[in-house]
Amino acid sequence: MKKFTTLLATAAVLVGFASCTKKEKETGKTLNIAVSAEIKGMDPIYANDRYSSNEVGRVYEGLLEYHYLKRPYTLVPNLAESMPSVSEDGLTYTFKIRQGVLFHDSEAFPNGKGRELVAEDFVYSIKRLADPKLQGLGWWLLDGKIKGLNEWREKYADLDKVDYDEVVEGLKATGKYTLEFKLTKPFPQFLYSLAMPFTFATAREVVEKYGKEFLNHPVGTGPFVLPVFKQTKKVVYTKNPNFRKKLYPTEASDEFKAAGFLEDAGKQLPLVDKVVVSVIIESQPRWLNFLKGNVDYIGIPKDNFDSAVTPERELSKEYKDKGISLMITPSLDVTYTAFNHDLKLFQNPDLRRAMSLAYDVKKSNELFYNNTSLPAQSVVPPGIAGNIPNYVSPYRGPNIEEAKKLLAKAGYPEGKGLPEITYDCPSGTVSRQIGDYMKQQMAQIGVRIKVVTNPWPELQKKITKRQVMLYGIAWGADYPDAENFLQLLYGPNKAPGANGSGYDNPEFNKLFKTASVMQDSPERTALYEKMNRIAAEQAPWIYGVHRQNFTLRHSFLKNYMSTDFETGQAQYLNIDTELKAKVTKKL
């Protein structure tokens, strides 16, 4: 999932050593959020999708985070006291851990009271990510990057028990509050990995107490507390009464200053007492709940777009009169349909190209995205170095005549001899419609598709275990670098890593490996562009679109903006309770 900047950025998010007191009065402020997929659990090492990442980010924290009000996106300290000191050779990173930070209260601790966070907690948490028995879904992020960590992982691959106390050369707590990383090579994106949920701090006592049930007993250091997670349609978080002193930013980029985002400057976080997350899979019930004031913000469903947004891309008067605001922001993402390259069938590039040419992405943009998205020519979205402006993929459909020729060249004239292909997608009306559209498009050239819908956690599991043939999905940036998109096609990242399709091209892999250790430069961008062209010409996916976010928010919701990095956002949001009472009376 998402973006980056300089190593020595300074934080305008003010963080001190004191914590909130339990005597602090509740304000009655509740943030109401609706999500469109089931939440699979609350274990950071499995938070590989937008939904679980956002939930994990309410409870857990990492060394670094993105400054909430600065663009370009800028890394700043979070549980780290400051940005790290970095050796001249770019291999050793030394962090000072913020003192006085407490884990949430839990039965796993003596007397049920949360203990202080120390550097060793990060050593343990990152070893969990590397643990071969656990198969953490974010291992691709650190694979081959920390000295001795791969060897530690390989040593225990065939043993019954993993020794977390064994010292790893490149991952050490050199003092109670001092954490040291030694890298195998310089990796420019390394710091971004420390702002991702995969590397967030967990307490060993809690993991060992709950074992396999740990994902249902989240205990972090974050702004909100959730004693027990249950697979229900509603999850309720409460303000962490022992949260450290962390204040709303006092600095912002000009666009946010002008929009009034500094009204809460200097206030203690979080600004609300509760966060209620409702799982509402279908778009129309989500929409109706938003209109009733039961949900504070929402992406506009496709079926309601024309009533909410004018042809000039402005909010219609009906909604303006209700105090609703419209935000339009480009998203660093790509939607796509992936082939399972483990199957011999899809190792045939002409079959992949034929299916790509049969797919009318322009029409799908009209049908499912209200013609607001940009058809994707390859994997890297606009706004990131490595995207090639004005580039047109040679296999961007629709071109039915050429698709039929390539299908015949692949050995399946008019689809003869080709087995029925299963297309897996998430549950929900729109996802099903997209699946049916795929079926109809492929039928034009004689390719038979069977659509199978899955609850989101089940689809994730099937992709991870490579139990799919063809599947529809989207990827949102973890950080703002083309490497984060190109790694989706890097062979060594095959599932359970981020490369769910299992695409493995030696030339692409070689270029990726070279670029991954290069600093930002024209030379690195040239390699990114070369990989982007390979990704278009080899058609490892059927490319969809780069989306644009059209988000509505109620006037009583403060400090909200659509962002590529939502993890931790809830702590900055505020509710004007008096205004909410007035507004909801009229809804």
Task: Show where each model-derived region lies.
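Detector for C-terminal structural segments
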Residues: E26, K185-P188, P218-V219, K230-V235, ...
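A structural "hinge/loop" feature
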Residues: A37-E55, L79, E107-N111, L137-G138, ...
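Aromatic- and charge-enriched surface segment that lines or borders ligand/interaction sites
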Residues: E81-L141, E180, R286-N289, L345-Q347
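Structural transition elements
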Residues: F224, F346, L374-A410, S427-Q433
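Extracellular/periplasmic solute-recognition and catalytic clefts
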Residues: P227-T238, E263-D264, V276-D342, E366
